[in-house]
């Protein structure tokens, strides 16, 4: 049985993310990233006859939500969906939901997944290399580290970790795994350190952070899934419906910003006196600059330091 005690989780940008959706009490809403259920719980407090659909592929998140949201589940105000959010449209269609009033995303790995040492997400805690958000999938960090060719590792480390020492780290991994498989998080973290110049080790922040991020993104296809899901969400939104997206690193933020820009920009032909409705932008940006955590939140929630919130509103189908 999945543990619920593991899900001690301080929800980032809780009020901002939900409040900016301008929740209608009778609306249909989606929490694409259930996690610790903080956003879901707060959004549910704003619903009367409305309904919330909460997605997560992590069984532990569902076990926790069944306890935390037990009252709302009993009242049939929320439906928990165990699925990757890239299946957003098809999963909702199975429930006869084709349009929604709003949706929120809290991207990346959740704090409880980091905190559970057995999940293999953390470079600070000894565990078998894993990093799977969905424990039923076959590809894990172990396979990426031990089976991917040198060139693929370099590409992943550079693209998803933006690490300038990608080649050196990939070469060190390649040499080490010829002797014996790299099995644990600490083993990998120590290997990464050994590949770096001494001056890099003295810099602020853990030297393995970027590489662990890159492997995690590869294992879970995080950016591919996010892009697919956000585009599906825009299509699902009713006119005037809103989408809130919290990101935690530059790759997620650039992706979100790029999608929002694509859907909120119109190239108007010269000499056109009036823009036809079908040529209007699908989205309107609610905030051009991302919303950041307040000083008050930063005092008790360290994870909020890198959080950025972007919100947009549907203008036309």
Swiss-Prot record:
It is found in: Cytoplasm. Keywords: Cytoplasm, Methyltransferase, rRNA processing, S-adenosyl-L-methionine, Transferase. Its main location: cytoplasm. GO terms for molecular function: rRNA (cytosine-N4-)-methyltransferase activity. Pfam families: Methyltransf_5. Its EC number is 2.1.1.199. The keyword Transferase applies. It catalyses: cytidine(1402) in 16S rRNA + S-adenosyl-L-methionine = N(4)-methylcytidine(1402) in 16S rRNA + S-adenosyl-L-homocysteine + H(+). InterPro entries: RsmH, SAM-dep_MeTrfase_MraW_recog, SAM-dependent_MTases_sf. S-adenosyl-L-methionine binds at residues 37-39, 56, 85, 106, 113. SUPFAM superfamilies: Putative methyltransferase TM0872, insert domain, S-adenosyl-L-methionine-dependent methyltransferases. GO terms for biological process: rRNA base methylation. GO terms for cellular component: cytoplasm. Transmembrane segments: none annotated. Belongs to the methyltransferase superfamily. RsmH family. Specifically methylates the N4 position of cytidine in position 1402 (C1402) of 16S rRNA. This is Ribosomal RNA small subunit methyltransferase H. It comes from Lactococcus lactis subsp. cremoris (strain MG1363).
């Amino acid at each position: 049985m999945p543990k619920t005690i593991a899900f001690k989780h301080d929800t980032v940008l809780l009020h901002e993310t939900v409040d900016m959706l301008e929740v209608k009490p009778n609306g249909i809403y989606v929490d694409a990233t259930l996690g610790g259920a903080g956003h879901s719980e707060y959004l549910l407090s704003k619903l009367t006859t409305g309904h919330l659909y909460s997605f997560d592929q992590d069984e532990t998140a569902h076990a926790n939500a069944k306890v935390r949201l037990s009252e709302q589940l009993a009242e049939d105000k929320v439906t928990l969906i165990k699925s990757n959010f890239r299946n957003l449209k098809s999963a909702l269609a199975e429930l006869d939901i084709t349009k929604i009033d709003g949706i929120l995303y809290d991207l990346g790995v959740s704090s409880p997944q980091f905190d559970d040492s057995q999940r293999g997400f953390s470079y600070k805690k000894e565990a078998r290399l894993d990093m799977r958000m969905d424990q039923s999938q076959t590809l894990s960090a172990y396979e990426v580290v031990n089976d991917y060719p040198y060139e693929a590792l370099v590409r992943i480390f550079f693209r998803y970790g933006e690490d300038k020492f990608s080649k050196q780290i990939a070469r060190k991994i390649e040499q080490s795994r010829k002797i014996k498989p790299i099995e644990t998080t600490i083993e990998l973290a120590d290997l990464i350190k050994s590949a770096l110049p001494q001056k890099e080790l003295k810099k602020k922040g853990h030297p393995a952070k970027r590489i662990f991020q890159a492997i995690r993104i590869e294992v879970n296809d995080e950016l591919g899934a996010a892009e697919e899901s956000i585009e599906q969400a825009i299509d699902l939104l009713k006119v005037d419906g809103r989408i809130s997206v919290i990101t935690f690193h530059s790759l997620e933020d650039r992706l979100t910003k790029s999608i929002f820009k694509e859907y909120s920009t119109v190239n108007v032909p010269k000499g056109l006196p009036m823009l036809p409705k079908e040529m209007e932008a699908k989205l309107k940006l609610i905030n051009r600059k991302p919303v950041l955590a307040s000083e008050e939140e930063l005092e008790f929630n360290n994870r909020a330091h890198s959080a950025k919130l972007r919100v947009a509103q549907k203008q036309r189908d």
